[in-house]
UniProtKB/Swiss-Prot annotation:
Gene Ontology molecular function: GTP binding; GTPase activity; nucleotide binding
Protein's organism: Dictyostelium discoideum (Social amoeba)
Entry keyword annotation includes Cell membrane: yes
Main location: membrane
Protein name listed in UniProt: Ras-related protein Rab-11B
Subcellular location: Cell membrane
Amino acid sequence: MVLKTIEYDYLCKIVVIGDSGVGKSNLLSRYNKNEFSVGKLSTIGVEFSTKTLKIDNKLIKLQLWDTAGQEKYNSITESYYKGAIGALIVYNIADRNSFNNLEKWLKKFRENAHQDYGIMLVGNKSDLKEYREVSTLEGKQFAEKHYMQFIETSALDSNNVETAFNNLFNFIYYSLFKNKTMTLDINNNGNNNSNIMVGDCEPIQFDQRYTINKPVYDCC
């Protein structure tokens, strides 16, 4: 029997959640491939992608889970929150209802995720300034109330997209991994589980291909 070699040092499962149509899939496409699709169809169930970062000569593999926002898929998508240690909870700044539903998404994530986690609240579609229904202050206050980071992004013009993901991972690394040992139960499509041991970590230095900023609660 041939044993598979694990080609990374750390594994980090992050889910992207929020109402249908807020731009979750395009945020991931912009972050992963620097692509944006006009008229992109809504996600059905769950889509999965990976991204590997090289940090201080260590490979960090991100599992990025794009979940459907429609109510009919809730029973499917919630099962994929298991083992997640990070979430981007996304709303559309031009859609008040998507903001009003944040409490629901936050509750579902906290009920199913790993006991230690980090959350980034993302007000997406910041390019739709003339149609804004949710102020930046409202987003910031919601994030502070629930102990989350906050940022506004535009998948269309790529504004703050990379920063949103990187700041979340930075928070997770320093707050959950640094000088701490954790075992993460990673659910691989519900088929099998693998325990990834996260050992003692030193302060990280990203190579020139990646930029990590200190966690922030607001941005322009």
